[in-house]
Amino acid sequence: MVVLPEGHPLAGQGQFPHKALLDYPFILLEKGEQSEIRTFFQDYDLPLRPCFVTLDDYAIMSMVESGLGISILPQLILQRCPYRIVQKELDVPAYREICFAFRSLDSLSLAARRFLDCLGSLRL
């Protein structure tokens, strides 16, 4: 999902045009060597020129809320977003794979079952 500050010129439109990511300061979420966002930019032949790079989702939400730029964040982290930001779907597919391995449903803890329920309720 693209996250924008409230009042952003594209906040009231439908899907966010992926090429418009180049028109605004971009805040990059960088976790580990394999970045899904870097891959997304490469897949759509977009040059990635972040104005800020951070490891923390909440830092990005705070920076976006403050008007420092826009970003792409996983839908899962945005479900309980405490910040005043706008969430928009992109006009092209952007996703990541989440794998969850277990021996049997009977062996799962309550927390693991709830996590599995949460994964099942996401729009895929």
Where are these regions (language model features)?
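Residues embedded in well-ordered beta-strands
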Residues: 1-3, 9, 27, 70, ...
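Flexible hinge/capping segments at coil-to-helix
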Residues: 4-26
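Secondary-structure junction motif
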Residues: 10, 24-44, 108-116
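Beta-alpha-beta core module
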Residues: 13-14, 58-107
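Short beta-strand-to-loop elements that line the ligand-binding cleft
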Residues: 28, 47-56
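Conserved glycosyltransferase catalytic-site signature
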Residues: 34, 56-57
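Extended ligand-binding regions for polar small-molecule ligands
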Residues: 101-124
